[in-house]
């Protein structure tokens, strides 16, 4: 069952102290970013792809994901590395709350060149702190 925002209730009910209980893969990722002095969004996304090995082809409403996206619509700005909460699935793709944009966005299947990396609720703040969103104007 989902609430009016499209999130699974159990995801919203989780109360996790992110500072004291981050997942091991995020700690490893943060350590690599610091050790390798990585600050380019492309390079950070590559490290995320190496660390986040649980992947899905089709998202599930109420779950969190990050992935690479190449928009087809001309003259729009888009995030090439979205971090989203999936809220709806359609034949053409899905809709998600993009945490980098802080807005709902539509994602079509054809514009996702790979798979969606599953993100756990308790990893969201840590990933947002990495600032790996890559905002592009599609010409």
For the regions a protein language model found, what residue spans apply to each?
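Generic structural motif
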Residues: 70-72, 89, 124
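Intrinsically disordered, low-complexity, charged/polar segments
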Residues: 98-139
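Mixed-charge, Lys/Arg-rich low-complexity intrinsically disordered regions
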Residues: 15, 19-61
């Amino acid at each position: 069952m989902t609430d009016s925002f499209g999130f699974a209730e159990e995801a919203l009910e989780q109360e996790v102290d992110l500072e004291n209980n981050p997942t091991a893969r995020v700690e490893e990722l943060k350590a690599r970013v610091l050790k390798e002095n990585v600050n380019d969004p492309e390079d950070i996304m590559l490290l995320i792809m190496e660390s986040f090995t649980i992947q899905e082809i089709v998202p599930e409403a109420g779950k969190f994901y990050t992935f690479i996206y190449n928009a087809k619509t001309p003259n729009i700005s888009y995030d090439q590395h979205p971090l989203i909460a999936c809220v709806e699935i359609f034949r053409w793709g899905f809709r998600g709350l993009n945490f980098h944009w802080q807005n709902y966005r539509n994602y079509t299947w054809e514009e996702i060149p790979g798979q969606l990396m599953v993100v756990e609720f308790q990893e969201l703040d840590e990933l947002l702190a990495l600032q790996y969103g890559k905002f592009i104007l599609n010409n």
